[in-house]
């Protein structure tokens, strides 16, 4: 029931103020005063009575104790990326992705299409041409083998090291960890996940035909041994149905070689990739997927030119000497046209096949370019090197021509080493050549045009030397050699060599 009051001032009975709602004074109903005097006395007593405070508690939401599990979240939408219930945290920032979430993947790294085996950074970057291109390669950090993902991102080449966890040995680069490299690559590529700083894997580069599997190569007879490994006669299986091809195989020593030495070994293959000429040894491919690393090349069933010249059983004829020098000039000219400097032209690096075709081989020191400057120690073929190389470390097509003159000396002295009898070795010989105190001389009868080529190839100044094209032109004019395009093999056409008379004898140079 509401009490009446002035208009607009309605208040329910027994309504208390805000403070009265929070704090209430208690007294018994039978002590309620009736008279004004009693009421005043009651008020005095009430003032002396202590007030009891009754605080109404605010209801609280029940807390979840540590032993209680939180309510389950709603089931996620079906997605490979949201399948977190199967994932296990490896570290705070890593999540292990199970194999069934990745999907079907070829887990043998050797068969993975984007894996290129052992490869140097420079060789790798030459293959990355478009934005998003990537490949996986093997390298060495200290004595430990590691895998690197190389990516072309915008205008930069980025090399991301694949790391491994300590306990489970899982592979990771940024956030997710996997049981294999192949799963890591497949997951990031399929789901467009950044492999590093926002970079995604767009286009994987497959291996080329010259990147061979070790299982394709069979090693047979050992033919020799070099600085980095051995040379074997072997066979190469090019396809399931084709017969094996007889090849020469250079194998790299598996022990005690640094990553830089392995890269130097493979530099020969890198130079040979684009070469194809009848007077240059044919390149089949490399095996870099696993040890041993191998370079597979054409097998020449003859000897090296050096062995042929030194042979006492069968002397090299005058006609064949000219033929071999012509073949060598054609091979060198082809290399220079491809901007390749051989840097080790010598009879030991010229191979002969059963058809007496000479082929330039051994590209271990070769470099791409027209001219380079390189200062390095080690064992250098001083007796074949040009003065500018010995003095300043300059290599060019002209320095190859200077070495071609040394090859001519070997041919016409039946395999003698240049400066063999001068009594100087090493640094003493180097200083004598630089100081013009000694020069190479052929003390035998030479055809006039051969003597002229020799003299012009051994000029001290690079600009005074003859070029490979000029040498070939002289051979064609004097002897009549030419190239038959249908077979790509050089043949001797004109029938007789110019007669050599004593009056035509012209020493190319005189030892001082």
Curated annotation (Swiss-Prot):
GO terms for molecular function: ATP binding; non-membrane spanning protein tyrosine kinase activity; signaling receptor binding. Its EC number is 2.7.10.2. Changing residue 405 to D: In hc108; self-sterility in hermaphrodites but normal male fertility. It is an enzyme of class 2 (transferase). Residues 114-205 form the SH2 domain. It is a peripheral membrane protein. Residues 68-78 have a biased composition (Pro residues). The keyword S-adenosyl-L-methionine does not apply. Probable non-receptor tyrosine-protein kinase which plays a role in spermatid activation (spermiogenesis) in hermaphrodites. This is Spermatocyte protein spe-8. The gene is spe-8.
């Amino acid at each position: 029931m509401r009490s009446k009051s002035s208009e607009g001032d309605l208040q329910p009975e027994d309504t208390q103020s805000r403070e009265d709602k929070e704090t209430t004074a208690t007294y018994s109903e039978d002590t309620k005063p009736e008279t004004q005097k009693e009421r005043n006395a009651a008020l005095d007593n009430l003032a002396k009575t202590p007030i009891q405070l009754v605080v109404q508690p605010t209801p609280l939401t029940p807390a979840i104790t540590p032993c209680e599990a939180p309510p389950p979240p709603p089931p996620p939408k079906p997605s490979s990326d949201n399948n977190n219930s199967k994932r296990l945290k490896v570290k705070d920032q890593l999540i292990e992705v199970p194999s069934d979430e990745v999907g079907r993947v070829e887990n043998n790294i050797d068969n993975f299409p984007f894996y290129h085996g052992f490869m140097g950074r420079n060789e790798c970057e030459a293959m990355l041409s478009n934005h998003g291109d990537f490949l996986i390669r093997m390298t060495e950090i200290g004595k430990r083998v590691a895998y690197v993902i190389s990516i072309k991102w915008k205008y930069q080449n980025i090399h991301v090291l694949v790391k491994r966890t300590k306990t489970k040995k899982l592979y990771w680069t940024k956030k997710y960890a996997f049981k294999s490299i192949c799963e890591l690559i497949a997951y990031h590529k399929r789901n467009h996940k950044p492999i590093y700083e926002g970079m995604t894997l767009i286009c994987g580069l497959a291996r080329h035909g010259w990147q061979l599997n070790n299982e394709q190569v069979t090693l047979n007879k050992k033919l020799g041994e070099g600085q980095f490994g051995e040379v074997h006669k072997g066979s190469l299986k090019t396809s399931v149905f084709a017969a094996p091809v007889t090849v020469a195989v250079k194998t790299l020593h598996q022990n005690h070689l640094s990553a830089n030495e392995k890269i130097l070994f493979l530099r020969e293959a890198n130079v040979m990739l684009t070469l194809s000429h009848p007077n240059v040894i044919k390149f089949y491919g490399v095996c870099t997927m696993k040890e041993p690393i191998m370079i597979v090349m054409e097998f020449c069933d003859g000897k090296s030119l050096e062995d042929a010249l030194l042979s006492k059983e069968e002397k090299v004829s005058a006609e064949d000497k000219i033929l071999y020098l012509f073949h060598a000039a054609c091979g060198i000219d082809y290399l220079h046209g491809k901007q390749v400097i051989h840097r080790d032209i010598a009879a030991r690096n010229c191979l002969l096949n059963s058809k007496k075709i000479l082929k330039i081989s051994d590209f271990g020191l070769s470099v791409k370019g027209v001219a380079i400057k390189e200062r390095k120690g080690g064992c250098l073929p001083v007796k074949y090197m040009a003065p500018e190389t010995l003095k300043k470390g300059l290599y060019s097509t002209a320095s190859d021509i200077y070495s071609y003159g040394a090859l001519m000396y070997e041919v016409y002295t039946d395999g003698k080493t240049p400066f063999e009898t001068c009594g100087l070795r090493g640094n003493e010989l180097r200083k004598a050549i630089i100081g013009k105190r000694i020069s190479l001389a052929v003390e035998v009868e030479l055809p006039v045009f051969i003597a002229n080529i020799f003299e012009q190839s051994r000029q001290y100044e690079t600009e005074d030397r003859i070029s490979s094209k000029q040498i070939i032109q002289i051979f064609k004019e004097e002897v009549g050699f030419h190239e038959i395009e249908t077979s790509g093999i050089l043949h001797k056409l004109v029938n007789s060599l110019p007669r050599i008379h004593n009056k035509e004898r012209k020493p190319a140079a005189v030892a001082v």
